[in-house]
Amino acid sequence: MYIDSVDNDCKVEDNTIGNNDEYGIVLHSANYNYLWNNTLYSNDLKDLQIETQSSSNFAIGTTFSSIGVDGSSDLTIREYFVLDVNDASGNNMSGIDIKVMEDDTLKYASSYFGGGDPKTDSYGTVETFLIDYVIYDRESTPTTIPTNVSVRSHDWVEILSLIHI
């Protein structure tokens, strides 16, 4: 599948692309494209090739084993952030203040942390949302974007750093 500069702002969704003689998907001078829930495998050159000033492209739920990103392009991998707060006995904790930072970007904050997002519900959860967790920025080696979560209940605050696997 070849996506070029004419094809900006595209959504490529629910495809299985494998066993090709060349590439699975190529983004060539293509910007603001979303790859949703695709499976790319066993393509001879690369499963995914991002090239020639392709920027602001995102992949969500897309699996691949090989990628090429040239020195003028980028791809950000996003994932769903799911939070479940429980006490030491495993019971759900409702009404807990939450703050989620994606590197230096505030993604979620309830009132204690100066935001307007809801505290945890009766299940100890907040609404699921997307976060950026890996970027291929002008290279084929991924850089992990740190996610930090702060949790506050009455008289304690805990800060957690998440490692994406």
Predicted segments with their positions:
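Short, acidic Ser/Thr/Gly-rich low-complexity loop/linker segments typical of extracellular
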Residues: 104-133
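A short, solvent-exposed beta-strand micro-motif common in secreted/extracellular proteins
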Residues: 127, 131-159
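A short, Gly/Thr-enriched small/hydrophobic beta-strand-prone motif that recurs across taxa
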Residues: 75-86
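Glycine-rich beta-solenoid repeat tracts in large extracellular/virion proteins
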Residues: 1-6, 23-29, 43-53, 65-75
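Short, ordered, surface-exposed loop/turn motifs in non-cytosolic proteins
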Residues: 89-112
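Conserved small/polar residues in nucleotide/adenosyl-binding loops
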Residues: 163-165
